[in-house]
Amino acid sequence: MASTVSAYKEKMKELSLLSLICSCFHTQPHPNTIYQYGDMEVKQLDKRASGQSFEVILKSPSDLSPESPILSSPPKKKDLSLEELQRRLEAAEERRKTQEAQVLKQLAEKREHEREVLHKALEENNNFSRLAEEKLNYKMELSREIREAHLAALRERLREKELHAAEVRRNKEQREEISG
């Protein structure tokens, strides 16, 4: 106590009264303040206008003293009655069945969706094949008609040439008979 009083007396000599009052109300923390929380230490490193930086140091399990409470141990459970255990088991079984039913429902919906997609793809493929076949048949029919028309035109020209040749021969024979 005496050392504290003498320290204050020395401080009084060095500082003005206003500075002393301000220092009592606004104490500055130690620059490397260390805070301890259970099995970790938080050390303040830097304080800037943009923010603060800290260093978090975790103690290893061997460093934990026996006086500190073990945080990872589960809380003590009270003894449960047989009825309570049975009720919990039934509730867990019900949850398991509900979850299993939900999974089965989702799988059934997924399979149904896959079937619908496959059916739609097959239908579109069949429609495409049918349209392509119809288009090909139309083109083949059109080509056949054009070919037949062309052949008919060639036959007609050939018949006309033969008729003309026959007429020319007749005229020549008639001229020979007349002249000769």
Curated annotation (Swiss-Prot):
Domain of life assignment: Eukaryota
Region of interest (Disordered), ranges: 60-82
InterPro entries, per the entry: Stathmin_CS, Stathmin_fam, Stathmin_sf
GO molecular function annotations of the record: tubulin binding
This protein's UniProt keywords: Coiled coil
Low complexity bias (residue ranges): 60-74
A GO-annotated cellular component: neuron projection
Coiled-coil features, chain-numbered ranges: 75-179
Biological process per Gene Ontology, one example term: neuron projection development
SLD domain location: 38-180
Family membership noted in the UniProt record: Belongs to the stathmin family.
Identification of the protein by name: Stathmin-3
Species of origin: Gallus gallus (Chicken)
